[in-house]
Amino acid sequence: MRTTVEQIGALIRATRKGLGVTPRELALTSGTGLRFDVDLERGKETCEIGKALTILQTLGIKLTLVSPSAVGKGE
């Protein structure tokens, strides 16, 4: 199953709201900037990966990467 930028943005938005954090507070805490945070939540495909990872970490969202060889081994 392919994960889309829109799905990642929706997860970030839902997590942020669930924590009671405003977009401005997230921008200040993560140091990424309000415009970037809003664009990422809206699923903008050209968002910088490093900043996106910073936001995920700030919100406590764990990202797991699985290589194709690991998938074939049932991992």
Protein language model annotation of sequence segments:
Residues 21-38:
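Short alpha-helical DNA-recognition segment
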Residues 1-18:
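A short, Lys/Arg-rich alpha-helix, primarily the initiator
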Residues 17, 28, 57:
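Short polybasic/polar patches that bind polyanions
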Residues 45-46, 57, 64-75:
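Short, charged recognition helix plus adjacent turn
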Residues 11, 22, 48-51:
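Residues that mark the N-terminal boundary/hinge immediately upstream of a DNA-recognition element
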Residues 52-56:
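Hydrophobic micro-packing sites on short alpha-helices
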Residues 2, 45-49:
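Alpha-helix boundary/capping and short turn/kink residues
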